[in-house]
């Protein structure tokens, strides 16, 4: 008898989990069960015949519904594109399919990726798997929630101001924003094209490395990404030739910025993580980066005009088809003069130069991913933080620097709060230093120990 392979059974199990979780989590806009099972049978036959396309061969993945998928509607979380069925895959999706990944569906996103809560008026809010009364974060909230809840090992997201790292931190997943341009954004509905970045969210750093091996083919090979071929038979990861460690690594911490107006529990957890890395051999060095103080102002002065430039085909003529928050942001963008946008572009370059200079003296930068814990979506517009800062804006304060500088940054779960909510540690590196970043993040995972599953995982098991 020909050898059989368990890929179809694994994909069927993943689809079953998605179905059970959907009423409570709402992580998906579209589930592609029939096509996923057909692709799984092909992958199973290939693997049974000894043909391996890499570590993602036969692995279920989700795709943020901002990213085009051939023959599958891609809504961008909007009413306006609610019936759009692309004729071809986005470049990143094509790379995943070439690597043998099985796309099981399109994950929920904040409308047009223009927000940080994933409270979507057209397809419903994504719920946090640790507490469904709280936000998942966004805009890649569906991808982060699905991974954190154990529905998937890997999902694709996009990050313009923190949209991979924010929900990864709030949901307890690993989220990587690669160097700008490292992964093609072709086929992604744009938010701000000079900042939009495609990247993976995974259950662990190793899962993110597996995705990077597929998304950046020149990185395939254990020396770069630290993953082998895999055989698709189980969720067990292939052996890694590198040994993640901290001795000899210098980590810079811009303390006056990253610990300013931060929830005390988050500051405590991240400082404990830094002490653990120091005890493991890293050198922790406080640094000054005053240029970061203007990141939020610079960021919105770039994102809003670039978003408006794309949406002028529909806005304001179809303003009623937008959610209130996105319509408000686009309306505000109309008041940003060209001079302000051009000044912001210049200041973005100044911020990037400052961060790159700092990375000449240290190997990595570190701090919290977000300054606050997950909050109810109803509080997103309430100025409850120091200085009247809105939660929906606060969550981008620590992620914006690495978006504006176009540097790679990763969020790794580091602790749970007293209320049982995830806290994210953010690490950043120099341009195209993803391998070093992943190795350090993996070393931190080893120090931290196993990460527990959220309460939702037990309810749907």
What are these regions (language model features)?
Residues 1-160, 275, 280, 357:
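Gly/Ser-rich catalytic/binding loops embedded in alpha/beta enzyme cores
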Residues 1-4, 62, 81-85, 196-203, ...:
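Short, well-ordered beta-strand elements within core beta-sheets of diverse protein domains
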Residues 9-11, 41, 264-288, 312-317, ...:
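Acyltransferase
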Residues 14, 36, 208, 251, ...:
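Residue-level signal for inorganic ion chemistry
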Residues 20, 24, 98, 149-226, ...:
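Structural helix-boundary/capping segments
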Residues 57-76, 248, 252, 302-356, ...:
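Short helix-loop capping/hinge segments that flank enzyme active sites or metal/cofactor-binding pockets
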Residues 79, 83, 342-343, 374-396:
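Short, surface-exposed loop/helix-turn segments at secondary-structure junctions
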Residues 356, 388-413:
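Small-aliphatic-rich amphipathic alpha-helix that forms the alpha element of a beta-alpha
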């Amino acid at each position: 008898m020909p050898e059989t392979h368990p890929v179809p059974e694994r994909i069927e199990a993943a689809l079953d989990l998605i179905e059970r979780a959907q009423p409570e989590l709402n992580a998906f806009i579209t589930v592609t069960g029939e096509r996923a099972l057909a692709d799984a049978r092909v992958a199973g036959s290939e693997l049974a015949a000894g043909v391996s396309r890499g570590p993602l061969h036969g692995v279920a993945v989700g795709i943020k519904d901002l990213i085009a998928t051939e023959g599958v509607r891609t809504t961008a979380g909007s009413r306006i594109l609610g019936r759009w069925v692309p004729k071809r895959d986005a470049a990143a999706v094509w790379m995943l399919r070439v690597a043998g990944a099985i796309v099981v569906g399109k994950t929920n996103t904040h409308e047009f990726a223009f927000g940080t809560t994933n409270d979507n008026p057209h397809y419903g809010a994504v719920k946090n798997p640790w507490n469904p009364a709280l936000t998942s974060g966004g805009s890649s909230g569906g991808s982060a929630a699905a991974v954190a809840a154990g529905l998937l090992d890997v999902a694709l997201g996009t990050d313009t101001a923190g949209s991979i790292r924010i929900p990864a931190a709030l949901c307890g997943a690993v989220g990587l924003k690669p160097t700008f341009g490292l992964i093609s954004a072709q086929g992604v509905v744009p938010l701000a094209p000079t900042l939009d970045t495609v990247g993976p969210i995974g259950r662990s750093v190793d899962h993110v490395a597996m995705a990077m091996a597929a998304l950046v083919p020149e990185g395939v090979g254990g020396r770069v990404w630290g993953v082998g071929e895999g055989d698709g038979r189980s969720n067990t990861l292939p052996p890694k030739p590198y040994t993640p460690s901290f001795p000899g690594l210098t980590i810079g911490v811009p303390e006056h910025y990253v610990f300013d107006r931060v929830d005390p529990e988050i500051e405590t957890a991240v400082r404990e993580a830094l002490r653990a890395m120091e005890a493991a051999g890293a050198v922790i060095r406080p640094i000054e980066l005053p240029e970061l103080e203007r990141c939020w102002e610079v960021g919105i002065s770039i994102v809003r005009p670039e978003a408006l430039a794309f949406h002028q085909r529909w806005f304001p003529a179809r303003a009623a088809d937008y959610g209130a928050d996105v319509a408000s942001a686009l309306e505000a963008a109309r008041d940003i003069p060209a001079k302000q946008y051009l000044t912001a572009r210049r200041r973005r370059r100044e911020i990037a130069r400052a961060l790159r200079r700092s990375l000449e003296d240290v190997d990595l930068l570190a701090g919290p991913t977000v300054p606050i814990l997950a909050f109810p979506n109803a509080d997103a517009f309430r100025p409850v933080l120091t200085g009247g800062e809105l939660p929906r804006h606060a969550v981008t304060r620590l992620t914006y620097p690495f978006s504006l500088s176009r540097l790679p940054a990763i969020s790794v779960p580091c602790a749970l709060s007293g209320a049982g909510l995830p806290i994210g540690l953010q690490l950043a590196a120099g341009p195209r230093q993803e391998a070093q970043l992943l190795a350090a993040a993996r070393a931190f995972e080893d120090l931290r120990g196993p990460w527990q599953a959220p309460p939702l995982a037990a309810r749907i098991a």
